[in-house]
Design a protein with these regions (language model features):
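Carbohydrate transferase catalytic cores enriched for Leloir-type hexosyltransferases
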Residues: 2-384
């Protein structure tokens, strides 16, 4: 008897896949990799850019890769991407970021990670001229509003982000589903064969030091952290602050004010995973001074490496980090200073936070995030 069961065809916009997409790239990589392992029934079409096309590999024979070498956020994305999508005869499309083409030709799901460009708009967050920034920000608001309105389901990475979406866009809470991100199995990262001392020396780092890993966008509040560190450094001359992140306009902007710190503030730039594990392992604490986060994955990854976390108490961070962090108000320099000094000096507190961190990260699984996302796909497809 012939089996006429319909095979669904699902597309995923994975142009941010992997390191080129930074934190968003990690989310997309884990979601795509896990979903195509979990679902051996549906067909998947994965849209990639030239830079990451060869990086994505799958043993699932029902997965097809499509080259969509289209820049993010531009006019070409709005015109060419719908054309590529329409050629694939998809039943459903997943956009893991807000940048959904206005004329998307198929039903879709969208993941919203935060509303930072609405809630935290600032000219300092861009290299664009003021007029161009205002125009792009205006169109951003249109694109995200239409994406949320037209999506069959909106995925949010935290309850905080869900509530922000519901309030901002006046939509029903049931249209937004929370799918927490996961924490990668950091043990799988390659360990550098060199001695830890050699790695620290390579980056001009001496112990003890505080660590931050991530970008330097204004909402990350690294300028505030540097000001607080200058107060601590006046009392603890042997302490360093290490700010790890690929050098760009935002990191370069931080350098002139720290020129007089005599090597106390280090900018290693991009650090490969093997070296980064050692930087995590030897640090005194991980400092997360952000003013706005939709989820806060970097702090969870620090916990996974066994590092105590001292964190801002803003937005989603208390929800995500729970009781496994020492919190401060990032707009109160005296409070930030006191909490950092506390984690430096109190060995019992450090051990307690490390142990709490190991327990906290068990709440977050990429496979569970993928499973919940797949459930959303299937629920929508059953109604089509």
């Amino acid at each position: 008897m012939k089996n006429n069961k319909k095979i669904n065809r699902i597309g995923i916009d994975a142009r941010f896949y992997g390191p080129i997409g930074k934190g968003l790239g990690r989310y997309i990589q884990e979601i795509v990799d896990n979903i195509v392992k979990l679902d051996q029934v549906s067909e998947y079409v994965v849209f990639l850019r030239r830079e990451n096309f060869s990086s994505f590999k799958s043993d699932n024979l029902k997965v097809k890769k499509i080259l969509a070498d289209i820049k993010w956020y531009g006019l070409a994305e709005q015109i060419l991407l719908p054309f590529l999508i329409s050629r694939q005869r998809l039943n459903l499309m997943h956009f893991p970021h807000f940048n959904v083409p206005i004329f998307c030709p198929v039903k879709f799901v969208v993941t919203i990670h935060d509303l930072i460009l609405i809630k935290f708009p600032t000219q300092r967050a861009t290299t664009l001229a003021p007029v161009i920034y205002k125009i792009k920000n205006f169109f951003y608001k249109i694109v995200i509003a239409l994406a949320i309105k037209r999506a069959r389901q909106v995925l949010a990475v935290s309850e905080y982000t869900k509530q922000e979406i519901v309030r901002q866009f006046k939509i029903k809470p049931e249209k937004v589903m929370v799918t927490y991100e996961g924490v990668a199995d950091l043990a799988r990262d390659k360990i550098n064969d060199h001695q830890p001392e050699d790695i620290l020396k390579k980056y001009h780092i001496t112990e003890p030091y505080l660590l931050y890993v991530g970008n330097a966008y204004p909402h990350k509040n690294l300028g505030g952290l540097i000001k607080v560190f200058s107060l601590i450094n006046g009392q603890q001359r042997n302490l360093q602050l290490v700010l790890v992140g690929k050098e760009d306009y935002f990191y370069r902007r931080l350098k002139p004010p720290v020129a007089n710190f005599n090597g106390a503030i280090i900018f290693p730039g991009y650090v490969p995973d093997g070296d980064l594990k050692i930087l995590y392992a030897r640090a005194r604490a991980y400092i997360f001074p952000s003013l706005y986060e939709g989820f806060g994955l970097p702090a969870l990854e620090a916990m996974a490496y066994g590092l105590p976390v001292v964190s801002s108490n803003k937005t989603s961070l208390p929800e995500i980090l729970g009781s496994a962090a020492v919190y401060f108000n990032p707009e109160n320099k005296a409070e930030m200073k006191a909490k950092i000094e506390l984690i430096i000096s109190d060995e019992n507190l450090r051990r307690e936070m490390i142990n709490r961190g190991y327990l906290q990260i068990k709440k977050y699984s990429w496979s569970e995030c993928a499973r919940q996302t797949l459930e959303v796909y299937n629920k929508i497809l059953k109604k089509l």
